[in-house]
């Protein structure tokens, strides 16, 4: 099974990296591409959806989020793009490819 993990360098993502390895081939995507197999551009939802389609995973696990709460108030557009528009694009790409989507969030 091929698993695409978005947000693999975050608090939840790092734990998921360890937990998902026994389940299949894990492809890690991060915003900056550091310690990742692919870069995930959350500022461009269409590009993000294309990346999801290109990877062709059976399961997409989204642990990525805009988590800078104070900054989100002053940069609401970026927070909305990452936490809403990007997630919608990921969901649409999963629908197109038949991939199962698992979305994680913390508060």
Residue ranges and their predicted role:
Residues 1-23:
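N-terminal Rossmann NAD(P)H-binding glycine-rich loop of SDR-like oxidoreductase domains
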Residues 2, 25, 56-58, 100:
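Structural signature of beta-strand start/N-cap positions in the alpha/beta core
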Residues 6, 29, 62-64, 101-106:
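SDR active-site strand-loop-helix element
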Residues 11, 25-33:
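Conserved glycine-rich Rossmann-like NAD(P)H-binding loop of the short-chain dehydrogenase/reductase
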Residues 20-21, 52, 94:
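A generic structural signal for well-ordered alpha-helical segments
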Residues 30-46:
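Rossmann-fold cofactor-recognition segment
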Residues 42-82:
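NAD(P)H-binding glycine-rich loop region in Rossmannoid oxidoreductase-like domains
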Residues 60, 74-102:
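NAD(P)-cofactor binding segment of oxidoreductase domains
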């Amino acid at each position: 099974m091929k698993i695409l993990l978005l947000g693999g360098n975050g608090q939840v993502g790092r734990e998921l990296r360890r937990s998902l390895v026994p389940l299949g081939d894990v492809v890690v995507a991060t915003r900056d591409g550091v310690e990742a197999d692919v870069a995930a551009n959350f500022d461009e939802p269409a590009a993000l959806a294309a990346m999801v389609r290109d990877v062709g995973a059976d399961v997409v696990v989204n642990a990525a989020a805009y988590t800078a709460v104070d900054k989100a108030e002053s940069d609401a557009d970026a927070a909305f793009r990452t936490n809403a528009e990007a997630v919608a694009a990921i969901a649409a790409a999963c629908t197109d490819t038949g991939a199962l989507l698992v979305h994680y969030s913390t508060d």
